[in-house]
């Protein structure tokens, strides 16, 4: 079976380096808030060309901390407003994005996507009072550059995929180092990257149970350990190589499968034609998803579905403003299928996956 994720292979390749990094971190005797956390935050600052980096326990908590900061700014600028701010989120993404804002007290509005799963542009980018956008880097695609990232009304989620230094970070970017991401932690981890010193100070205080403000506000305990950061620093040495390998695999599949888009039933690669893509997942759309899903798994290819439903269909979203059931995002959710995608795939496995998909549609 070609497993969907390459965690076992990556560990086998890096075992000695990871165990050595773990030993060095443990021998320091400082398991949190130590030198490896500092080193990793400095590396990430340089990688993203952003002045301030704050690590935390997960990408979801990173996004929630940004949301809590923006809510506090909203309350100062709208002292008599009885309504919380509103965040516009794409209807097709993992529920963690929505949960971060719900937990921070925001109103949530779900927005339809284009045919590649990226959120359509809303009026929020022009900065109306209390309205914000949160474009998500779904599957590794970068949100449209049409978003005015630097206007303070955009919060970016999913920046873990591309990790580039173009300066377009809006109010701040939330980054996840979940083990399935392009730059993975061995356990969990996240980060906030920003040019905003006030957001930086808020995040530093909030993640440490508000100790820096002498507990003048509430906070939480949200940290990456020294061991996590020591191990992820090992992986930073390979990230460029891994990203290039992902691009090569994606380009190969897009070439091999391109003609299937014009068949009935057909298949379309969602990364095809997307200019900036880090290929954290390789997702195809087909009206015959269930048939292809079963065929691939029966032939030793572990396919998965990301995601079988939209956020608007979840019980928690029953009162949210959202697209209708014939929207693009809902239609996508009924046909998306994820193929195994990781740098450790062999050339033979990449070719085998292509051959099996082609055989399915040529039968």
Q: Each PLM stretch: what is its role?
A:
Residues 30, 34-86, 100-104, 110:
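Phosphate-binding glycine-rich loop
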Residues 59, 93, 342:
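Conserved glycine-rich SAM-binding loop
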Residues 114-185, 191-193, 197:
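Active-site phosphate-binding strand-loop segment of PLP-dependent enzymes
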Residues 92-98:
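Conserved coil-to-alpha-helix start sites within the AMP-binding
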